[in-house]
């Protein structure tokens, strides 16, 4: 079990570090953060597939265009990797994380139906400063998010989201009323 957290908008590296520190037990092997303009990405790693430091996250493509934080396991990543290698994609790790980066580079959001597994991830594209989040169809890997007036915030657990200074843990009574009305 790994953990991811991050934001796009108002925030700092310290905010990303505080967010991932709240869920550091999800990844005892390494906690790391990166800032990409106004986007902060953080990862708590539990090494399973590729134990090398080359597979540490946040992970970027060699050209730095795409950066990912990923929690989960892609069961068919070896088959996907073979197909990508046939089309000229080079790999430096044996991790399923790197396969996701190359799949996104090749197919964009169209990659999702190709995935078999359990996952939650965020991919930042430096080309247009976009942030793409996805989780598996059944929601086995959690991915919580919140929108404020100046930031989009996400994390594997609510604790990480609430650690961002732009998020207030106050109860929104209007939202509760909407939820309970049927």
Predicted features by range, described:
Residues 1-182:
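Cysteine-centered catalytic environments shared across enzyme families
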